[in-house]
Amino acid sequence: MYRRIENKETDSIKENSKLIMHIVWIFCIGIFTVAPELIKLFINAGYAEASVIVPPICLGIFFQMMYTFFYDIEYYHKKNKQIALFSVITAVINIVLNYVAIHIWGYQAAAYTTIISYMILCVLHYFGMKKVDKTQYYDLKTLISLSAVLIMITIANVVFNNSIWIRYAILLDSGIYILIRYKSLVISLYNNILEKIAERKKQSN
């Protein structure tokens, strides 16, 4: 990563980061789609209501992933004090939000305060990155669009938590989008898997 930054390999960084964004994006959707069934199956049906906090937790993970993109640029430019300052600011905000929200709405509020904290941290690191390096390393349009769609899907999964058909329909649509978006990559991976299987069969014979 840092070698690419040094060499200004912006196209490579941009394409790799977009792929990572999409992988984490579909991973988050997959996790909170199957969460209600997994909780009932492996934990206890009495904890089924806990499944409603899985979508916001996954959304928080997505924003956590995004801020690391901007963090890498800041770290490359040795802006350690700036990085530390942003972490402290976000930690204080998170503590205050938790103190207020948990007392009012209960433990589930912690999942939403975490989202807010990571979103703030993401924004801080983005502007911190732009302050030290004006190079366009990331596709901001993709980042914003994926974030917006994931927020809407998160809300839909919380609202329709008890509707298995709606949840899995959203997952199916999201999966189709990924397959279309990375059709050539999926085909390439599929062909590589077939080649490896064929090689192993030859070796076994």
Report the location of each language-model feature.
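Interhelical loop/hinge segments that connect adjacent transmembrane helices in multipass membrane
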Residues: 3-11, 131-145, 191-202
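Hydrophobic transmembrane alpha-helices of multi-pass small-molecule transporters
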Residues: 28, 65-68, 91-98, 118-126, ...
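Specific pore-lining/lateral-gate transmembrane helices of multi-pass inner-membrane transport
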Residues: 1-87
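Membrane-proximal transmembrane or re-entrant/amphipathic helices at the cytosolic face
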Residues: 157-205
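Membrane-interface helix-loop junctions in multi-pass transport and translocation proteins
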Residues: 51, 78-81, 87-123, 158-172
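Juxtamembrane "helix-exit" motif on the non-cytosolic side of transmembrane helices
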Residues: 39-42, 155-161
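Membrane-embedded alpha-helical segments of multi-pass transporters/permeases
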Residues: 28-36, 41, 53, 95, ...
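Alpha-helical transmembrane segments
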Residues: 70-78, 125-140
